[in-house]
C-alpha cells in the first residue's frame, strides 16, 4: 500500500491535533504536531528570558535557534507522542496558558518558521506521516496527497480547550481562553510569514457539531479515497 503525506491545517483548538493523532494511530502513520514545535520554541524563550512583556528579543532568539532541539517520543501510557525540548519532556508545560499567550509572536518570526519548516520537511521525506498545523498544505507540503482544513466556531473551540486543559489538571477560565482563541485567529490569519489559509485543493471540515467518532469516520473515508482503496 502506497504511503502518502496527510496535511491537516486549521484554526487553533479546532480539534485538528486530536483528529491527526487518532488517524495516524489508526492507519499506522507517524504523527507530527507542528504546533507543539512552535510552543516548544516559545517555552525555550520563556526559560531563557527572551520576552520583554509581549515583545520577543529577536536577535537573542536568532542566535540560539540552532541550539533548540525538538523531538517526539511515544508515550507508552497514552499511546501518543510527547514533545521533548533538548531532551526534556515538556508536553505538559507547552500546553499551559503562559505559552499559549506568547506563541503567536514567536510563530510570526520568519527565521523561526524557516527553521521549523525545514525540520518538518525533513521529517516528512519518507512519507507515511500525518502533520497538522497552520501552513502544512500551503507551505510545508504544498504537494501533499491529502490536504484537510479543519474549523469550528471560536466558542466551541474555547470550550474544547478549557475541557482539554482541565483534563490535564491545568486550571483555565473560559473567558480568558475565548479571548486567546480570537486573538490567535487574528494574528495567525494576518501575519506576513505563512499566514493561516486554506489550500485551494484542501477538503474543508467544520466539526462544530460533530462527535469524535463522526470526525474519525470522515477522515478515514478521505484517506481511503486518497490512496485509492
From Swiss-Prot:
Pfam families: Cytidylate_kin. Gene3D superfamilies: P-loop containing nucleotide triphosphate hydrolases. It is found in: Cytoplasm. ATP binds at residues 10-18. The keyword Hydrolase does not apply. GO terms for cellular component: cytosol. Its EC number is 2.7.4.25. It catalyses: CMP + ATP = CDP + ADP; dCMP + ATP = dCDP + ADP. It is an enzyme of class 2 (transferase). Keywords: ATP-binding, Cytoplasm, Kinase, Nucleotide-binding, Transferase. One of its GO terms (biological process) is pyrimidine nucleotide metabolic process. GO terms for molecular function: ATP binding; CMP kinase activity; dCMP kinase activity. Belongs to the cytidylate kinase family. Type 1 subfamily. This is Cytidylate kinase. It comes from Parabacteroides distasonis (strain ATCC 8503 / DSM 20701 / CIP 104284 / JCM 5825 / NCTC 11152). The gene is cmk.
